A protein has these predicted regions:
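Active-site-adjacent helical/loop segments in soluble small-molecule enzymes
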Residues: 134
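Short strand-turn-strand beta-turns centered on an Asx-Gly dipeptide
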Residues: 40-41, 166-168
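Outer-membrane beta-barrel proteins, especially TonB-dependent receptors
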Residues: 94, 101-125, 139, 144-157, ...
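Gly/Thr-rich phosphate-binding loop signature of adenosyl cofactor/nucleotide-binding cores
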Residues: 697-699
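Bacterial Sec-dependent N-terminal signal peptides
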Residues: 1-23, 737
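Periplasm-facing N-terminal accessory domains of Gram-negative outer-membrane beta-barrel systems
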Residues: 17-98
Length: 737
């Protein structure tokens, strides 16, 4: 009797335990260690143990999405069902076409199979900046000067046309100007999702050129305090950066906190001179907290970033003549002086505060989401004096409601979004007057997916009101955006077709600018007669892969009506050339992106990835090309992974090569640029079980080159422009606990 009781007791314990755990195995039914189990709707992750098992957190609602992923295996997305054993068998994946392939994955922006979404994992341990990391994707470039000021360019479009979201909040800063960065760093981020073109309905009412959605790393299901401390040194800028991160959870409470401090001097050119005033400093703190019950989840986030950015290649010359190269370069470097940001001019002081609250409610197959965000941006620009030439506050508040329902193979999203923006000047002189804009959008999206076939269709209506009391101006802008997609898979062939449209209202800077824009050395005039900019895009993606080779072909065509541009005039105001905003009736952007991945059978640890990006632009009004059209590029990455026991400390070696073709397809007011080659090398090691080391060399052959999108390529008196940094090395060290 005692034996029977004991057996029944252990059977009951095992039965209860089995309901709260799952297991991940390979094709041979062997448990897989270190598999990421991401509960998508709860923004919560955990990792499988050495036998492949994992414990399911308590109170996970039925029908919640779970993404199971591990490098070298095909990602799976399943729906959670309580009281059911979870056993996932992952298939080996020899060929992975970076983050551009059409695969099953859970995304904030939509279904990857039905919408043109690309994803990039963001690692705390990286030899490149946040922006440079993203530009490894085909068709993505950056515009800026050095590491301090960088901005994303997608298929030749940037600024107001490429909308940036951070944890659900649209970032409203000086995104209309190329002399300002994106306003935050890689601190605490987990990945970024990218939509190229105008098919972002849920978030992108004005995303004519694309949408970037940055997401924090998920919360961690673990009562043990975990985190990291990392440090980085890059001798191109003599950059010194330090970061930390902590994660902890208990009884359905979750906490993440991150901090960062980075300082950099003027960057070194290939001839060993230094570009004066390209130095910068960045400080950041980020905090997230969450509480979860069976049906509800609350998330609060706060983030603060403070930046001090020098503006290089800026000389106040009342004669408007050529600049002497010696005025913007220096021959030596003094760390004590160059780390001092208080003495340099011109200078930008940027302070950003971001507050976010999210609430999710789950019931049956439904998910209700409420989102509230508040963003405060303060910009001060100093010229040659102690008080700022500009001091402006930009405040943005955003509310969003979304209802998601799953019915068999259908997923329905219905929602609305309201945004209020206002800017206030605190100086007598200003570039943009005080003004407000308020807009509201309504959208509906229907997805259908069954086995190897799927489609989606959606529409969005936006209404925007812009007010500027200084000019006695009030105007309304409204339009409809739409998107539709079709997905089909046959054996190893996958094809997706997407057609979308979007619109963009004129920004305050385009309507009412009237002043010197110090970062660009020009006097800018707005145009209050500007109308809505409308874009339509056709995007086709074909994918084929075998065990050792994969290819993606992605042609696209985009037409933009009433394209807003800024052009020079034949006049001078306050010793600066005058530029005025204008509008072109029709602009066409077309091109092709090709991605290849080769994984030889005889050497399974070798990966060869290559992408080709081709973009052509045409202004039908002038029969010329658009300004700042990126040059065509070939990006090649060769990576060797090491798993041999005698090289246990060595993880991988990678070589990254960019070949940029010459760009002769220029607008009426810009100069062509030459072709160039840049080679970077990274070596990744694990010194101890919890210490990672990454050593890199950038611009290995010390190539002297000026990208066509460089912000400092058209400096008067400097033929060919100012080059990017020369050869440099960087060291990254990270301790994880």
């Amino acid at each position: 009797m005692r034996i029977i009781f004991t057996v029944l007791f252990f059977f009951q314990i095992f039965s209860i335990f089995s309901q709260d755990q799952g297991v991940v195995v390979n094709q041979e039914s062997v448990g897989l260690e270190g598999v990421t189990i991401l509960f998508v709707d709860q923004n919560l992750e955990l990792y499988s143990k050495d036998d492949g098992s994992f414990i399911i957190p308590k109170s996970i609602p039925d029908n919640s999405l779970i993404e199971i992923k591990k490098s070298g295996y095909i990602t799976q997305v399943i729906q959670f069902k309580s009281n059911e054993n979870i056993e996932i068998k992952l298939e080996s994946l020899h060929v992975q076409l970076d983050e551009v392939e059409i695969i099953e994955s859970a995304n904030q922006l939509g279904n990857t199979k039905l919408v043109s979404i690309e994803k990039k994992v963001l690692n705390d341990l990286s030899t490149s900046s946040l922006v440079e990391n993203i530009t490894q994707l085909s068709g993505v470039n950056w515009i800026g000067s050095g590491l301090g000021i960088q901005k994303i360019v997608v298929r030749g479009l940037s600024g107001m046309r490429v909308v940036t979201y951070l944890n659900g909040m649209r970032i409203e800063n000086q995104q209309w100007a190329n002399d300002h960065g994106i306003g935050f760093t890689e601190l605490g981020l987990g990945e970024v999702e990218l939509i190229k073109g105008s098919s972002a309905l849920k978030y992108g009412g004005e995303a004519v050129g694309g949408l970037l959605y940055f997401k924090d790393a998920p919360f961690l299901e673990s009562e043990k305090l975990s985190g990291f401390v990392s440090t980085k040194f890059d001798n191109s800028h003599f950059l010194s950066g330090n970061k930390f991160g902590l994660k902890w959870s208990k009884n359905n409470f979750y906490f993440n906190i991150y901090g960062q401090y980075t300082i950099a001097t003027d960057y070194r050119l290939p001839d060993n001179t230094y570009l004066y005033n390209s130095r910068f400093r960045n400080q950041g703190i980020k905090f997230s907290a969450s509480y979860r019950s069976e049906k509800t989840q609350h998330i609060f986030r706060y983030q603060h970033n403070a930046e001090q950015l020098g503006i290089p290649a800026h000389v106040c010359d009342p004669t408007l003549g050529d600049i002497d190269f010696s005025q913007i370069l220096s021959n030596d470097l003094s760390l004590s002086e160059d780390y001092d940001m208080s003495v340099i001019r011109p200078l930008q002081n940027v302070s950003n505060h971001l507050f976010i609250y999210e609430n999710n409610y789950f019931i049956n197959n439904n998910k209700f989401s409420f989102y509230a965000g508040h963003f405060i941006n303060n910009l001060k620009e100093y010229e040659k004096v102690t008080y700022p030439a500009f001091d402006m506050d930009l405040v943005s508040t955003q509310l969003r409601l979304n209802f998601r329902k799953k019915v068999n193979y259908f997923t329905i999203n219905i929602g609305s979004q309201a945004t209020s923006n206002s800017n206030k000047n605190h100086t007598v002189d200003y570039l943009i007057p005080d003004g407000t804009s308020n807009d509201i959008g309504l959208y509906s999206i229907l997805d259908y997916e069954k086995k190897n076939l799927g489609f989606n269709v959606g529409a969005r209506l936006d209404y925007k009101e812009v007010t500027c009391d200084s000019y006695n101006f009030q105007n309304n802008f409204s339009s409809v955006s739409s998107s539709s997609g079709l997905f089909y898979k046959y054996k190893d062939h996958v094809i997706r077709l997407t057609y979308s449209s979007a619109f963009r209202s004129p920004h305050l800077s385009e309507l009412f600018s009237d002043g010197v824009h110090h970062g660009t050395n020009r006097y800018e005039l707005g145009n209050s007669n500007l109308d809505i900019e409308k874009g339509r895009q056709l995007d086709i993606k074909y994918q084929w892969s075998s065990q050792h080779f994969g290819v993606i072909l992605n042609p696209f065509l985009q037409n933009i009506k009433n394209y807003i541009s800024i052009n020079p005039l034949d006049s001078i105001i306050e010793n600066n050339r005058v530029f005025e905003y204008t509008q072109f009736e029709k602009v066409t952007i077309s091109g092709m992106e090709i991605n290849l991945h080769y994984h030889p059978h005889f050497m399974h640890n070798l990966h060869l990835e290559q992408s080709y990006s081709i973009v052509e632009t045409k202004n039908h009004d002038t029969n010329k090309y658009l300004a700042l059209t990126p040059s065509n590029k070939i990006k090649t990455k060769v990576r060797i992974d090491f798993k041999q026991k005698n090289l246990k400390f060595l993880k991988n070696i990678s070589l990254y090569h960019i070949y940029s073709f010459e760009q002769n397809n220029v607008s009426q007011f810009e100069l062509p640029t030459d072709s160039y080659n840049v080679v970077n090398v990274d070596v990744s090691c694990m010194l101890l079980k919890k210490i990672d080391l990454l050593i890199g060399i950038s611009n290995l052959f010390n190539e002297e080159y000026v990208p066509h999108l460089s912000r400092i390529k058209d400096v008067p008196g400097v033929p060919g422009g100012i080059p990017n940094p020369g050869r440099s090395f960087n060291i990254n060290l990270k301790y994880t606990f």
